[in-house]
A protein has these predicted regions:
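Structural motif
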Residues: 66-77, 87-89, 131-136
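Short, positively charged and aromatic/hydrophobic N-terminal segments
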Residues: 6, 14, 25, 46, ...
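Alpha-helical ds-nucleic-acid-binding substructure associated with the helix-hairpin-helix region
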Residues: 103-175
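Short, aromatic/basic-rich helix-turn unit that serves as a nucleic-acid recognition element
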Residues: 79-83
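Cysteine-centered motifs
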Residues: 20, 37-38, 42
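Intrinsic disorder/low-complexity segments enriched in small, polar and charged residues
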Residues: 7-11, 18, 28-29, 85
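Basic polycationic patches enriched in arginine
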Residues: 2, 15, 40-41, 53
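C-terminal accessory module of base-excision DNA glycosylases/AP lyases that mediates lesion recognition
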Residues: 21, 49-68, 73, 167-172, ...
Length: 247
């Protein structure tokens, strides 16, 4: 059955016959966190390839196959990982969404938004914690989920698909999310453009130095362990230069 659903006829059949379990969801979408499907849900059935939404992603940020599969298939998980990417190793940050998904039974954006804040903070603090500061990050993640629900109908990918934004508009939308300053927003835009198939007009210009091809300066440039090492070396050089400038 799974093989049939990934053929053109199977995809058409799925779109025509599967009814969603809630009227606010369009046809054919399953929960985020299932490899190869989009961040929606329907009443049973199989997932549709993420490429149907114009994205082709095989990320290698967490350096863990299952955690990276979640990031590749779930735009919301990728957003959460980016939020966590500060003051800890980036691999640990991008492994965070999988930890949360394992503990609450998936990373459905509605479920995260509606979770009891105290309980969600406790879950995020369980060892191994999702972050050095799990309590504050738990709140930020729930705030992010609520914005995705309120502004984008629970579809994190609508951040870059709704209204066909150009690079400048998409950067503006990203900066409006909790935890995204100018630089982090540009890095995320660079990641979307370089690895997530989000080639909106002007994305490289809006992403600044993080949109330049052939660089190894941010998360946007990490595709394997080797490039992770190059990015880490670059950041070490930046810190050393900053320290020398203060001396």
């Amino acid at each position: 059955m799974r093989t049939f659903l990934y053929t053109p006829w199977g995809i058409l059949w799925h779109r025509l016959l599967v009814k969603c379990n809630q009227s606010k969801y369009p046809l054919g979408y399953l929960p985020a966190g299932v490899p190869g499907c989009c961040p929606r849900r329907c009443a049973g059935g199989e997932g549709l390839p993420v490429t149907l939404r114009g994205m082709t992603a095989t990320l290698c940020l967490a350096q863990e196959p299952e955690a990276d599969a979640l990031l590749s298939s779930s735009p919301f998980a990728l957003l959460v990982g980016m939020v966590l990417d500060q003051q800890i190793l980036l691999e640990a940050a991008f492994a965070g969404p999988k930890k949360i998904a394992d503990r609450i039974g998936g990373l459905d954006v509605y479920k995260v938004a509606d979770f009891d804040p105290i309980e969600f903070a406790r879950i995020c603090s369980e060892k191994p914690a999702i972050h050095r500061f799990p309590g504050s990050m738990a709140k930020r993640i729930q705030d992010l989920a609520q914005i995705v629900v309120d502004r984008y109908g629970g579809d994190a990918a609508a951040l870059w698909t709704a209204g066909d934004p150009d690079g400048a508009e998409l950067l503006k939308r990203i900066k409006a999310l909790p935890g995204f300053g100018e630089q982090k927003a540009q890095i995320f835009l660079g990641l979307l453009g370089k690895q997530y198939g989000v080639s909106v007009p002007g994305w490289r210009e809006a992403a600044g130095q993080f949109g330049v091809a052939g660089t190894y300066i941010s998360v946007a440039d990490i595709v394997d362990a080797q490039t992770l090492g190059k990015v880490r070396d670059y950041k070490k050089k930046l810190k050393a230069a900053a320290k020398a400038a203060k001396a």
